[in-house]
Regions:
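C-terminal long alpha-helix characteristic of the crotonase
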Residues: 24, 132-137, 188-239, 250-255, ...
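Conserved CoA-thioester-binding segment of acyl-CoA-metabolizing enzymes
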Residues: 1-59, 75, 279-291
């Protein structure tokens, strides 16, 4: 184990971090302790230069059944969402706090959906770079059925993946959809047979994406594509790409990347995410006082 937590596990396999929601007796229902644990785990992975990517999955037969409803009709009042109190003039939703932390990860994120993902269990997967799922898994954006609205910045992420009309259909109805349907509409990137070990599949995918690439370049690429794919025109993307190419072009990693190609060998990159990010990153300041 990389570190011990109350509601999750965090371990390393082949330089890949495996984060599992670990309340299987509650179908990994989400609570404030889980929020704190996941946030800390992502901080831990970002700090550790030996870890190249993070996989998010669940223990047991479910990925996450959504918010822990054990408080009954008090579940969604302000006493439940204590993490959201902070210093804003409004109470931030816990799912959004979680999703924004995943979104800001410096390492690639793969969601490996081992079973049903409902409510925040579905929305926390949206900021993952890749989403894979077992064929038996189901997804449900059930918020309207609980008398609330989608959380976790879903109104920003979900339409980017499946389009506005399909997003509205999923959120209006709250219907559970199969992973196969999720794959057809763009929610899921890869379907995995139930007999396969989804963690093994996710690890191989993570290694494929990272083992021959500069970690700093991967971190910057992740933030570039997530940040600038939503710009009104491409000029802002061009400005940032130009700055980053200038910055990375004189780095030791750039020299190694060129020479390893010319010498027909695997690269040995030395730059570290913890030390070698450009001095103008992050290029966008958070709107929230607690960040």
């Amino acid at each position: 184990m990389i570190k011990e937590y109350k509601t999750i596990t965090l371990q390393e396999i082949d330089s890949i971090a495996i984060l599992k929601l670990n309340r299987p007796e509650k179908l990994n229902a989400f609570n404030m302790q889980m929020l704190e644990d996941i946030m800390d785990a992502f901080d831990e992975v970002d700090r550790n230069d030996n870890l190249k990517a993070i996989i998010l999955s669940g223990a047991g037969r479910a990925f996450c059944a959504g918010a822990d409803l054990s408080a009954g009709d008090k579940t969604f009042d302000k006493n439940f969402d204590t993490r959201g109190e902070f210093e804003e003039d409004f109470r931030r939703d816990a799912g959004g706090i979680l999703v924004l932390r995943i979104y800001n990860s410096l390492k690639p994120v793969i969601a490996a959906c081992n079973g049903d993902a409902v409510g925040v269990g579905a929305t926390m997967q949206l900021p993952a770079d890749i989403r894979i799922a077992k064929k038996s898994a189901r997804y449900g954006f059930v918020f309207a059925r609980r008398g609330i609205v989608p959380d976790g910045c879903a109104s920003w992420f979900l339409p980017k993946l499946v389009g506005i009309s399909k997003s509205l259909e999923l959120c209006y109805s709250g219907d559970l959809i199969s992973a196969e349907e999720g794959s057809k509409i763009g929610l899921i990137n890869y379907l995995i047979d139930d007999e396969e070990n989804i963690i093994d599949v996710a690890i191989e995918l993570a290694k494929k994406m990272t083992e021959n690439s500069s970690q700093v370049s991967v971190a910057m690429t992740r933030h570039m594509l997530w940040s600038y794919s939503s710009e009104i025109d491409p000029e802002e993307a061009h400005i940032m790409e130009s700055k980053l190419i200038d910055s990375r072009g004189v780095s030791d990693d750039a020299k190694e990347g060129v020479m390893s190609f010319l010498e027909k060998r695997k690269p040995k990159f030395s730059n570290k995410v913890s030390e070698d990010l450009p001095n103008f990153f992050p290029w966008r300041k958070s709107k929230f006082k607690d960040n």
